[in-house]
């Protein structure tokens, strides 16, 4: 048993070290500096520098905000894989449910007094679109000039951006009482950015700028608490709260720079092998205030295996969305200028999740899942896989 613990600790230390070692020597500028260089230095003469600058800054700020928002709101594992209760008839502690619970949606059952867990999750994400616009194929137009009545511009500047994140999150849960538990998540993030800006004038392409940056470090730490108000077998109701602390580097887009608080209500119903779970909450402060909601269906496929499907949603208030504006050129008759900028508006973001929880041995729990966006709001990847290992202490 001692050897196993040493191996686990070494594995965790190695994974975190590899992330923190990612700051390369040639990326002395911050990620936000490189992003600003790629987005704001537009070269097409439009005759209106002020509007050009305003649109470029708004675009840069929106892309930065959406990246930080994605890192800050990427779902983290729910607590309570193993749940326990005292059986008065037997006078001993037994499993409160045969199910290992949802993936990201919280459930009302708690860990139990004196119970604790420690785990590590890993996720690697390559983002390929933002607000429905491709980031990687060179079709993201920053500025363009077009003759009125034509279908294609004669001078167009496009941006290509490749964002990739690798995240290792250390998770822990402690049961304070049978009705109260506390958990925390500590993310370590490696962020890579590569991009270029290309001008296409009447079919002649010229690379205007290119750049890359890489950084790694601590993200925003999450602390949660759940309190069980009512329990009937494996069903019940609970209230919870989540605090995200601004521990990530804001300049390198690893953190939000502000504390957010999310109170939530949690409900669960379990009957035989099937469970239905739901939660609703509201995020205050942070990158954007948001109504959050989630629902999950769990099925005990075998004594050691739980299958899970979930729907996760957020209604974001005044989040920036990329839009194109078209205005007449102030000096050239019959020519319009197209600019990429942003507009603050309320937007809905939905994710569907499928995965499983497998009790591989003793109280070791392996969780594997994949997320798929159902809307084009914000920064998106086609698929977001993640794997988590948890150990529950007896």
Name the predicted role of every residue range.
Residues 130-135, 195-201, 239-242, 249-257, ...:
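Outer-membrane beta-barrel translocator domains and adjoining extracellular loop/strand segments
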Residues 122-128, 186-192, 229, 243-249, ...:
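Transmembrane beta-strands of outer-membrane beta-barrel pores
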Residues 100, 106-107, 118-120, 170-176, ...:
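Residues on the lipid-exposed face of transmembrane beta-strands in outer-membrane beta-barrel proteins
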Residues 138-142, 148, 206, 296-394:
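Outer membrane beta-barrel transmembrane domains
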Residues 28-183, 187-219, 323-335:
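A subset of solvent-exposed loop/turn segments in beta-rich extracellular surface proteins, enriched
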Residues 100, 112-116, 164-170, 212, ...:
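Residues that define the transmembrane beta-barrel architecture of outer-membrane proteins
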Residues 103-105, 154-158, 206-212, 249-253, ...:
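Extracellular loop and loop/strand-boundary signature of outer-membrane beta-barrel proteins
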């Amino acid at each position: 048993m001692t050897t196993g613990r040493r191996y686990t600790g070494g594995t965790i230390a190695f994974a975190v070290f590899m992330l923190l070692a990612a700051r390369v020597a040639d990326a002395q500028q911050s990620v936000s500096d490189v992003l600003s260089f790629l987005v704001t230095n537009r070269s097409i003469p439009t005759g209106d520098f002020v509007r050009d600058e305003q649109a470029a800054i708004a675009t840069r700020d929106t892309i930065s905000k959406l990246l930080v928002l994605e890192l800050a709101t990427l779902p983290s594992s729910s607590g309570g894989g193993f749940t326990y209760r005292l059986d008065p008839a037997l006078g001993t502690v037994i499993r409160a449910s045969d199910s290992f619970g949802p993936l990201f949606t919280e459930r009302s059952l708690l860990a139990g007094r004196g119970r604790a867990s420690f785990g590590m999750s890993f996720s690697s994400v390559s983002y390929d679109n933002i607000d429905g616009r491709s980031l990687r194929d060179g079709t993201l137009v920053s500025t363009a000039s077009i003759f009125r009545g034509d279908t294609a511009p004669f001078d167009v500047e496009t941006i290509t951006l490749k964002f990739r994140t690798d995240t290792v999150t250390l998770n822990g849960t402690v049961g304070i009482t049978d009705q109260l538990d506390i958990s925390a998540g500590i993310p370590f993030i490696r962020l890579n950015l590569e991009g270029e800006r290309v001008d296409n004038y009447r079919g002649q392409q010229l690379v205007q700028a290119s750049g890359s940056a890489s950084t790694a470090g601590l993200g925003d730490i999450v602390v949660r608490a759940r309190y069980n108000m009512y329990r009937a077998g494996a069903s019940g109701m609970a209230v919870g709260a989540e605090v995200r602390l601004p521990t990530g580097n804001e300049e390198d887009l690893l953190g939000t720079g502000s504390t957010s608080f999310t109170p939530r209500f949690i409900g669960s119903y379990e009957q035989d092998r099937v469970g239905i779970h739901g939660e609703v909450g509201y995020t205050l402060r942070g990158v954007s205030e948001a109504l959050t909601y989630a629902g999950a269906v769990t099925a005990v496929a075998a004594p050691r295996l739980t299958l899970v499907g979930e729907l996760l949603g957020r209604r974001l208030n005044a989040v920036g969305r990329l839009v194109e504006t078209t205005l007449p050129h102030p000096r050239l008759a019959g020519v319009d200028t197209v600019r990429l900028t942003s507009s603050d508006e309320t937007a809905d973001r939905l994710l569907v999740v499928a995965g499983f929880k497998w009790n591989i041995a003793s109280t070791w729990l392996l969780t594997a899942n994949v997320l798929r966006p159902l809307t084009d709001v914000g920064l998106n990847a086609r698929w977001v896989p993640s794997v988590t290992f948890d150990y529950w202490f007896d």
